[in-house]
From Swiss-Prot:
It comes from Metarhizium majus (strain ARSEF 297). It holds the Pfam family p450. The keyword Metal-binding applies. Heme binds at residue 288. Keywords: Heme, Iron, Metal-binding, Monooxygenase, Oxidoreductase. Pathway: Secondary metabolite biosynthesis. One of its GO terms (molecular function) is heme binding. InterPro entries: Cyt_P450 (IPR001128), Cyt_P450_E_grp-IV (IPR002403), Cyt_P450_sf (IPR036396), Cytochrome_P450_monoxygenase (IPR050121). This is Cytochrome P450 monooxygenase ppzG. The keyword Metal-binding applies. Its EC number is 1.-.-.-. It is an enzyme of class 1 (oxidoreductase). Belongs to the cytochrome P450 family. Cytochrome P450 monooxygenase; part of the gene cluster that mediates the biosynthesis of pyrrolopyrazines, secondary metabolites showing insecticidal activity. The role of ppzG within the pathway has still to be determined. The single multifunctional NRPS ppzA is sufficient to produce peramine via condensation of 1-pyrroline-5-carboxylate and arginine, N-methylation of the alpha-amino group of arginine and reduction of the thioester and the cyclization to form an iminium ion resulting in release from the peptide synthetase.
Length: 310
């Protein structure tokens, strides 16, 4: 995910470079995803107050905001992210320093990474009035991608690997399917377009997404003008407590959509696309734009895991 968002990543942020398999950005992200998102969703006024407190007081109010404080607060820290070591508390300024480094460092840059795309959008645009993307916007997008990439991929990959490991028939099917398109393991991993055509692999990935649910409950939504009637209930317009959401768990476990929903069955996807019923990334105009990006690394990462048995 870091390589997708940034073009130059310091070693300290590469988990595999750490003997502890632990980097400060991942730790902070994990802390954010405990009670923090729940509090922000249901008590936005409380979160606004807490995030304005000095960092020394945040943990006194609630430890749930320590990770968020580390990620979002811009401090006067002078630590260099690209030095040999980095104190954990310096995560408070990680995103800001990474974005600034993307703007100023000399050397090869990945022009297709998220941050470089945002920084150079005004140069690529044909509009004569296009202006540079504000740094605050770039930081916000970088944080969003980092949060999303840290939360879901480990869960989905771990579940898919576990389910395949306990099912010899599934293992054999994946092995044969992959060796048919990748006979020489010394050659590069096949392209995503080719892997996506493999029905069993695609089914394992999508079934893993269905079982892990993504963000289980969507962000708050107020009912529009005129109100609404949902499930037999009248919901008033713009009511401050009228939050309408369909948790993905109940959709993914709906027997009228998925037969035997509690059974991990990758082959169900070969007979039915179920695209509109897989809501881990939500659906509609406001759905997560990273759905296709998420599916691609799951499939390409699952391939080496499956081939290791050979």
């Amino acid at each position: 995910m870091n390589d997708f968002v940034f073009s130059d990543i310091p070693d300290i942020l590469k988990p595999m470079a750490s003997v502890e398999f632990d980097d400060p950005l991942t730790k902070a992200t994990g802390d954010v995803l405990n009670w923090t998102l729940w509090l922000i969703r249901n008590f936005p006024a409380l979160s606004n107050i807490i995030m304005r407190l000095p960092s020394s007081l945040v943990s006194i109010v609630t430890s749930s905001f320590e990770g968020a404080n580390q990620m979002f607060q811009v401090t006067t820290s002078t630590h260099n992210l690209y030095s040999a070591s980095l104190p954990t508390h310096a995560t408070k300024q990680i995103i800001s320093k990474l974005v600034e480094h993307e703007k100023t460092h000399i050397g090869p840059k990945n022009k297709d990474c998220v941050v470089q795309r945002l920084l150079n959008a005004h140069r690529d645009s044909e509009s004569k009035i296009s202006i540079p993307t504000p740094d605050a916007t770039v930081r916000s997008e970088a944080i969003g991608f980092t949060l999303a990439g840290t939360a879901d991929p480990p869960n989905i990959l771990a579940l898919g690997t576990f389910m395949a490991a306990r099912d010899p028939e599934m293992q054999e099917g994946l092995y044969k399917e992959l060796r048919a398109v990748w006979p020489d393991l010394r050659s590069p991993v096949p392209s995503y377009n080719l892997l996506h055509q493999l029905p069993l692999l695609r089914g394992v990935v999508k079934e893993s997404i269905r079982f892990t649910h993504g963000v289980a409950t969507g962000p708050a939504r107020l009912v529009g003008a005129g109100g609404a009637r949902i499930g037999g209930y009248n919901v008033p317009a713009k009511a401050s407590l009228a939050v309408v959401a369909a948790p993905s768990y109940f959709v993914h476990m709906d027997e009228t959509v998925f037969s035997e929903p509690e059974k991990f069955e990758p082959r169900r996807w070969a007979d039915n696309d179920y695209s509109k019923s897989l809501v881990a990334f939500s659906r509609g105009r406001r759905m997560c734009p990273a759905e296709q990006f998420h599916v691609e690394p799951y499939e390409t990462t699952s391939v080496p895991r499956s081939e290791e048995r050979g």
